[in-house]
Regions:
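Short C-terminal tail/terminal secondary-structure segment
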Residues: 2, 149, 228, 239-252
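Conserved glycine-rich cofactor-binding loop
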Residues: 10, 17-19
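Substrate-binding pocket helix/loop in short-chain dehydrogenase/reductase
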Residues: 72, 100-101, 105-113, 208
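Short, small/polar-rich loop/turn modules that mediate ligand/substrate recognition or access, typified
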Residues: 90, 176, 181, 238-240
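Active-site helix of classical SDR
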Residues: 124, 160, 168
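Alpha-helical segment proximal to the catalytic Tyr-Lys
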Residues: 129, 173-177, 236
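Residue(s) in the substrate-gating loop at a strand-loop-helix junction
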Residues: 144
Length: 252
């Protein structure tokens, strides 16, 4: 990205240390935004911060557990104090569990919902206080095409991402009069650490790719243009939408 669509703006990206979160942070920085980077791993965040700074933008590293209310509050406070405000929130932190329901312990279910749903709620609530007060802002929630599919062994993940889609729609209506747009991006299979084990199994990967008309997984960088669109002025009259980017898998 070389345009300055987001010049003068500040973004928070959760789960920013790798995969789609890293791609989002670099895309927003490439479009001119300063970026607060949040995730559990400080080492990963420091590497991404260096890449953001190489693009000429400021980066703020804030190790954060998005399921912890106080930690999320600190993330927002440090962003406002360190970078001067908040204009964009990207809720990307997420986990997956591939356990059939009858074998899945409640703790496994809770782990998925705590990160994917509670984490999205906490960050949106904390950042939203600033966005609503200033009368402008963007929230981009990372959902999944699994929100629209029944996938055996993924009840918790599918349900959690469907919750993110419903939350997106609700907050878009609630905050529309405050000029805050809330949209979601629903990737399909994208080559990240979340599916590294799957990709290491040639037979399992081949089975997955047969369900994708494009016959391949996406790359994190292919999500970047959508991040900039949903975080920038091109989406000023777009809210409550979930954009599916999955190589045609949901269209089948």
């Amino acid at each position: 990205m070389t345009d300055q669509t987001l010049s003068g703006r500040t973004a928070i990206v959760t789960g920013a240390g790798r995969g789609i979160g890293r791609a989002a942070a670099l895309a927003l920085a490439g479009a001119g935004a300063d970026v607060a980077l949040a995730a559990r791993s400080e080492d990963q965040l420091e590497r991404v911060a260096g890449e953001v700074e190489d693009l000429g933008r400021r980066a703020l590293v804030v190790p954060t557990d998005v399921t912890d209310r106080d930690a999320v509050a600190r993330l927002v406070t440090r962003t406002v104090e360190g970078l001067g405000g908040i204009d964009v929130l990207v809720n990307n932190s997420g986990v997956v569990d591939s356990t059939p329901l009858l074998a899945q312990e409640p703790e496994q279910w809770d782990r998925v919902f705590d990160t994917n749903v509670r984490g999205t709620y906490l960050a949106t609530r904390a950042a939203g206080e600033h966005l609503v007060a200033q009368g402008s802002g963007k929230v981009v929630n990372i959902a999944s095409n699994f929100a629209f599919k029944g996938v055996p062994g993924h009840a918790a993940y599918c349900a959690s991402k469907a919750a993110v889609v419903a939350f997106t729609r609700t907050m878009s209506v609630e905050w529309a009069r405050h000029n805050v747009q809330v949209n979601a991006l629903a990737p399909g299979y994208v080559a990240t650490d979340l599916n590294a084990e799957l990709r290491a199994d040639e037979e399992a990967q081949a089975k997955v790719l047969r369900s994708v008309p494009a016959r391949r997984m996406g790359e994190p960088e292919e999500m970047a243009p959508w991040m900039v669109l949903l975080a920038g002025p091109a989406s000023d009259f777009m809210t409550g939408e979930t954009v599916v980017v999955d190589g045609g898998q949901t269209a089948r």
